[in-house]
């Protein structure tokens, strides 16, 4: 008997949600007098179906995440050689997704162009590759969605959509002002995510120090409550330095004018 093949078949069936046990496969093999190679071939087929389903899940997660697909931001594509510090390994190890599984939030704080959004997107993409639902949006977009939801009576739907993903990324906090009602909604989202079960991570990026966020959220008590819940268990990366942007820019100096003298005829 080829027990490993039966185990692989049962494992693949479980992952693709087919009710078919290794005992059933063994019984079928006996009834039809299947040779060992046939059982291995069946295991290969189920393994392929499992891989195909996994890829479909990943593709769907990426599609719904709003992360870039043409030029994806990945950890492999990030220049870690430009980042220095005593605890750099805390940053380089993010690809393990340990914050997601330990239910720890992430914040990337620093000036423009140091890689905050790239790192947040890279983490989100890793979540997608692990089959975890991820959603990316800018703080300005969230603010607009809140205002729209209030206008058309879709607040419950909006909050549920923000709580549902395992990983929610809000980029560029401090680029817009949330009015009193939207600040309350912001608190509601953070509060519900803080008690959400299962793998869970919320990511903020910002050019502003968190102590200055009160300038961008009108309702101070709700903001304080949201920040208290978010930073209760979070990894905060304060990144200093010059912008990465413009590294590929080439400056070419040219001069306009006639290259040959103009001959005057009278």
Can you say where each PLM-predicted feature lies in the sequence?
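Charged, compositionally biased N-terminal leader segments and the immediate start
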Residues: 1-23
